[in-house]
UniProtKB/Swiss-Prot annotation:
Residues 222-285 are annotated as: Multimerization. This is Phosphoprotein. It is found in: Host cytoplasm. Belongs to the rubulavirus/avulavirus P protein family. GO terms for cellular component: host cell cytoplasm. Homotetramer. Interacts (via multimerization domain) with polymerase L; this interaction forms the polymerase L-P complex. Interacts (via N-terminus) with N0 (via Ncore); this interaction allows P to chaperon N0 to avoid N polymerization before encapsidation. Interacts (via C-terminus) with N-RNA template; this interaction positions the polymerase on the template for both transcription and replication. Residues 75-101, 127-180, 203-212 have a biased composition (Polar residues). Residues 46-105, 127-181, 193-217 are annotated as: Disordered. The lineage of its organism: Viruses, Riboviria, Orthornavirae, Negarnaviricota, Haploviricotina. Essential cofactor of the RNA polymerase L that plays a central role in the transcription and replication by forming the polymerase complex with RNA polymerase L and recruiting L to the genomic N-RNA template for RNA synthesis. Also plays a central role in the encapsidation of nascent RNA chains by forming the encapsidation complex with the nucleocapsid protein N (N-P complex). Acts as a chaperone for newly synthesized free N protein, so-called N0, allowing encapsidation of nascent RNA chains during replication.
Amino acid sequence: MATFTDAEIDELFETSGTVIDNIITAQGKPAETVGRSAIPQGKTKVLSAAWEKHGSIQPPASQDNPDRQDRSDKQPSTPEQTTPHDSPPATSADQPPTQATDEAVDTQLRTGASNSLLLMLDKLSNKSSNAKKGPWSSPQEGNHQRPTQQQGSQPSRGNSQERPQNQVKAAPGNQGTDVNTAYHGQWEESQLSAGATPHGLRSKQSQNNTPVSADHFHPPVDFVQAMMSIMEGISQRVSKVAYQVDLVFKQTSSIPMMGSEIQQLKTFVAVMEANLGMMKILDPGCANISSLSDLRAVARSHPVLVSGPGDPSPYVIQGGEMALNKLSQPVPHPSELIKPATACGPDIGVERDTVRALIMSRPMHPSSSAKLLSKLDAAGSIEEIRKIKRLALNG
């Protein structure tokens, strides 16, 4: 079973809260994607290259027809003619190449693409064609155009070798000369005009941004449901762990009480052992019994009573008399009933036997019990025997 610390549990709760907030505040997925990318696998590089090529195509105004280039190469060089301010650039003649180019690009993009992607690209191409027509047909384009006489003061702009992309066609009124002139009014219009300009002319001096490949685009957020299920599983596991920890705490809370109860039991057992030892000492008939097995053996032996008068001949003395003791038992010799008069005092033999039984019944080390027994045998007075008895009770 995995264990979690308090810090890990707090981190899990914070992470789950952050994920839930992101899920609540996240934007809805498009209806056409349904959690998956509309671009098939393996087509990203081809589509990105085609789109970059489509974006890099120059407007038709900056390109010359091949037949005109051939004719201009064959014709002798003529001086440049000025363009009038009110002459609009050619627009209608330039639309067919643009449409053909868009159709070619769309044909390339349709390879391996889905219907939703093709529809999106068609809309973008329509918007780009409308944006091309807007700036050329605007009524204010005369304000942005400049006559070609000012090109003499700006030779750097007129250099067609450094900027071949800035070349534009001449006005329709002067098409008879078939001369290509560098027209800078169109470049400034592409910079100053407002609105959508998807096909602005390139300039090496203005390219400050680095192109980024479309291969590393972020996938759609289709793993939210998986994250939610993972977080739910983690929360369930954390709750189970917390419940098990509570059970462990409840079970371990009784350990100190159990220790105190065990100590009390030890004390009770010691008191009972001392009481049993004293009971053995006070029992004069069982002074030599120090174990339960010996006590049971003594209990098994019981006296046997023989009924009838019996044979009194062994107890009959001369003259047909019989000597009886205090318990009315026959005594074979009457001299046993006569005892010498002695001073009254404690019997040292009985006291020694009692202390010996006490030492043997006590749970002591064998060396300690042997030492006390040797002292008991060497004792010659009641006081010494009582001292040995105290040592046996205390040890």
